[in-house]
UniProtKB/Swiss-Prot annotation:
The lineage of its organism: Bacteria, Pseudomonadati, Chlorobiota, Chlorobiia, Chlorobiales. The gene is fusA. Residues 8-291 form the tr-type G domain. One of its GO terms (cellular component) is cytoplasm. One of its GO terms (biological process) is ribosome disassembly. GO terms for molecular function: GTP binding; GTPase activity; translation elongation factor activity. Catalyzes the GTP-dependent ribosomal translocation step during translation elongation. During this step, the ribosome changes from the pre-translocational (PRE) to the post-translocational (POST) state as the newly formed A-site-bound peptidyl-tRNA and P-site-bound deacylated tRNA move to the P and E sites, respectively. Catalyzes the coordinated movement of the two tRNA molecules, the mRNA and conformational changes in the ribosome. It comes from Chlorobium luteolum (strain DSM 273 / BCRC 81028 / 2530). GTP binds at residues 17-24, 90-94, 144-147. SMART domains: EFG_C, EFG_IV. Its main location: cytoplasm. PANTHER family: RIBOSOME-RELEASING FACTOR 2, MITOCHONDRIAL, TRANSLATION ELONGATION FACTOR G-RELATED. Keywords: Cytoplasm, Elongation factor, GTP-binding, Nucleotide-binding, Protein biosynthesis. The keyword Thylakoid does not apply. This is Elongation factor G.
Length: 704
């Protein structure tokens, strides 16, 4: 099977937005217009193709990033009539599923940022935008739901500029808003596009409506000024009053979009079939191909030497596994992006993270949850492999004779945990295996056993995250389980720097044990985790025992000195010690490391930390006082407030422990008229009275 489409005509894109901005409906329309669907599915009737889990269909939200492939030839522009392949990842908008967005953006070359014309920039829009900035992903903005009452295109553009610190440049302006939304003015071609009222999929080109001529001229000048700033020759033409051609505008707009210095803004109503085809044209015109992204850098797994791979079919194969999913028919599916070379079904790949070789059974091109077998994938492709048993999210797959490790993905730590237990003996046998499969799929989901009680604990990014995973246990794995009350994932750290000696000696007949270590224990800045420094000089501790000291310290960090919670953001330096020729062993130094760390941590002003959440509440004005008073009573700190789309919003930082059950309380407080969103912000020190109570609770072993 030869390459269907040249590499410069491939677009790997994500659709990213806040929940309810219309992502899944927009993707459905894309599939319909590109000929992949014969009937359009609607989210509100549970018929959307990209939402294929039962829970997604029930809740009308997207949980997993469904991947699909389609083809599009633009009707206008610099690529007019040329067939392009578009690989789309439909990402979730709920904050509990940010990991799906994060891992999608890592392997994409561009994104369509969707905004609701009524709500504008919402909290999840900010979160996703930050994630896209982190990976330097070029974007076009699509202001959706222009047909809704209260839609305001220009206000949304203003909020993109102010709240996201971006440079939005409209290349269309709407003709009418709300119920009278009829189409838009194309500012590049200076033509009006009016849609057929019945189905919206047909349109006609008209002269710009008389009442919009001045506004269209103003916004065209705004667009020309923005692109002129990027290109000196264009600036000269603009200042001299010369005509700038459509082709020149598109060319420079593309360059600026790829540098993320301009965000082209379009408008439409996906539900009413208006604007989607032109958004597809913009994807082809302005977003990157794998060639624009150029080389990726990695390193050799053994020598750590830098290794560069280019998007070229003739180079050795290198790809990144960005998602693991369990498919009811084919088993474990590994979604991967090919960065260089080609991969045939049936061939072997090296997992350079584990060092293991595995065989690719089949290679599948995914269309939401339907699949199509293909013989070969090429540089720039996104596909799914069957047959890889030990691959984890973020692993590099490569040619065994040319190993490379690509940059790994970093995922946030879970902030909430619950105890889970099987309902019956039959469930008990399946629970462990099923939880392990779910943990394989989702790097922010953790499973552990509490050492004190023997209970199984599951941890995740929020209540909805864990609720859906427990629901999947029941539906997909047929495991019934009872769950306890949610618990906060507290952490511990230290505030001072101390030196401490850890000594383990046992010499009472027979072979003894001897290990002595001198450690410096000090705080690291937030988010740095753990750092171990080997500063031993002159062989006072043999080299083979040093990893054991490190292992002992890490073991001790799992069970903190304040209330037994895991410790974080700590640097430990091993600078001296002693050993015994006969009695020293790895075990002795592991225990000495553990004793030294625990003793040092107790003297280093240890503190208890709790997760603080960034909360936004949107409420009718009459309930504003109640909402703010309630947030303050939850130890919340009000950060700001304002007005948006006829409602008041409040920004606050609140401890997670005070937010359990908040949705129910907010509903009753506002008669169901307010809503809120919440995301993890950082860990902060727990007030002394609460820390004391947690300590007492932990001592009595009633915590779980």
């Amino acid at each position: 099977m030869t390459r269907q489409v040249a590499l410069d005509k491939v677009r790997n894109i994500g659709i990213m937005a806040h929940i309810d901005a219309g992502k899944t409906t927009t993707t459905e329309r894309i599939l319909y217009y590109t000929g992949r669907l014969h009937r359009m599915g609607e989210v509100h009737d549970g018929g959307a193709t990209m939402d294929w889990m039962d829970q997604e269909k029930e809740r009308g939200i997207t949980i997993t990033s469904a991947a699909t492939t389609c083809f599009w030839a633009p009707k206008f522009g610099n690529y007019e009539g040329e067939k392009h392949r578009i690989n789309i990842i439909d990402t979730p908008g709920h904050v509990d599923f940010t990991v799906e967005v994060e891992r999608s953006l890592r392997v994409l070359d561009g994104a369509v940022a969707l905004f609701c014309a009524v709500g504008g920039v919402e909290p999840q829009s900010e979160t996703v935008w930050r994630q896209a900035n982190k990976y330097g992903v070029p974007r076009v903005a699509y202001v959706n739901k222009m047909d809704r009452t209260g839609a305001d295109f220009f206000d949304t553009v203003k909020s993109i500029k102010e709240r996201l610190s971006a440079n939005p440049v409209p290349i269309q302006i709407p003709i009418g808003e709300g119920e009278i939304f009829a189409g838009f003015v194309d500012l590049i071609r200076m033509k009006g596009i009016i849609y057929d009222k019945e189905d919206g999929s047909t349109y006609e080109e008209v002269a710009i409506p008389h009442d919009l001529e001045n506004e269209a001229r103003t916004w065209r000048i705004n667009m020309l000024e923005a692109v002129s700033e990027v290109d000196e020759s264009l600036l000269e033409k603009y200042l001299n009053g010369e005509d700038i051609t459509e082709m020149e505008i598109r060319k420079v707009l593309r360059q600026a979009t790829l540098k993320v210095s301009i965000i082209p803004v379009l408008c439409g109503s996906s539900f009413k079939n208006k604007g989607v085809q032109f958004m597809l044209d913009a994807v082809v015109d302005y977003l990157a191909s794998p060639l624009d992204d150029g080389e990726v850098e990695g390193h050799h797994p053994r020598t750590e030497e830098p290794v560069v791979r280019h998007p070229n079919d003739d180079e050795p194969f290198a790809g990144l596994a960005f998602k693991i999913a369990t498919d009811p028919f084919v088993g474990k599916l590994t979604f991967f992006r090919v960065y260089s070379g080609t991969l045939k079904a049936g061939s072997y790949v090296l997992n350079s993270i584990t060092g293991k070789k595995e065989r690719i059974g089949r290679v599948l091109q995914m269309h939401s949850n339907k699949r199509e077998d293909i013989d070969c994938v090429y540089a720039g492709d996104i596909a799914a492999a069957v047959g890889l048993k030990e691959v984890r999210t973020g692993d590099t797959l490569c040619d065994e004779n040319n190993p490379v490790v690509l940059e790994k993905m970093v995922f946030p730590e879970p902030v909430i945990q619950i105890a889970i237990e099987p309902k019956t003996k039959a469930d008990s046998d399946k629970l462990g295996m099923s939880l392990a499969k779910l943990a394989e799929e989702d790097p922010t989901f953790r499973v552990k056993t509490d050492d004190e009680t023997g209970q199984t604990l599951i941890a995740g990014m929020g209540e909805l995250h864990l609720e859906i995973l427990v629901d999947r246990l029941k539906r997909e794995f047929k495991v019934e389980a009872n769950v306890g009350q949610p618990q906060v994932a507290y952490r511990e750290t230290i505030r001072a720097k101390v030196d401490f000696e850890g000594k383990f000696v046992r010499q009472s007949g027979g072979k003894g044990q001897f290990g002595l270590v001198n450690l410096t224990v000090e705080p690291l800045e937030e988010g740095k985790g753990y750092e171990f420094v080997d500063a031993v000089k002159g062989g006072v501790i043999p080299r083979e025992y040093i990893p054991a000291v490190n292992a002992g310290i890490q073991q001790a960090m799992k069970d903190g000195v304040v209330a037994g919670y895991p410790m974080q953001d700590i640097k430990v330096t091993l600078y001296d010690g002693k050993y015994h020729d006969v009695d020293s062993s790895e075990m002795a130094f592991k225990i000495a490391g553990s004793i030294g760390f625990k003793g040092g941590a107790r003297k280093a002003s240890p503190v208890l930390l709790e997760p603080i959440m960034k909360v936004e509440v949107v409420t009718p004005e009459e309930y504003l006082g109640d909402v703010m008073g309630d947030l303050s009573s939850r130890r919340g700190h009000i950060e700001g407030m304002g007005q948006r789309a006829g409602a008041q919003f409040v920004h606050a930082k609140v401890p997670l422990s005070a937010m359990f059950g908040y949705s129910t309380d907010l509903r009753s407080m506002t008669q169901g008229r307010a809503n809120y969103s919440m995301e993890f912000e950082s860990y902060r020190e727990v007030p002394k009275n609460i820390a004391d109570a947690l300590q007492d609770k932990r001592v009595t072993k009633d915590d779980y």
